Amino acid sequence: MVKCSISSIGNVKSISKSNNLSSLSNSSSSLQSMNSIQCGGGCGNGGLLGGVGGLVGGVLVGTGVIVGSVLHGVGSILTGGSNNCGCN
C-alpha cells in the first residue's frame, strides 16, 4: 500500500511550473514526488484529472524520468490501482 502526502503533490506542481531544469538536479527526489501523483486519485477528488494534470506537468518539464513516472501513474489510475492508495 502506497501512502501519498499532499506536501509531495504540492512540490510536484511547483516543479512543473518551473522553467529552470536545474531545479530538477536531484532526479531521485523528483521521482519520489512523482510517485505521490500515482496515488493522488485516492486523495480527495483528484481521480483521473489528477493523473492527467501530472502528465501535462511532466511533459512541460521534459525529463524522461518524470514523464515515465507519470505515464505509469496514469496507467495505475486507469486500471483502478489508485484505489489501493491512501493519504497522510
Curated annotation (Swiss-Prot):
* Residue spans crossing the bilayer: none
Give the InterPro entries listed for this entry: HssA/B-related
UniProt family annotation: Belongs to the hssA/B family.
Q: Which PANTHER family match?
A: HSSA/B-LIKE PROTEIN 17-RELATED, HSSA_B-LIKE PROTEIN 17-RELATED
Protein name, as recorded: HssA/B-like protein 19
Question: What organism does the record attribute this protein to?
Answer: Dictyostelium discoideum
Q: What is the phylogenetic placement of the source species in the record? A: Eukaryota, Amoebozoa, Evosea, Eumycetozoa, Dictyostelia
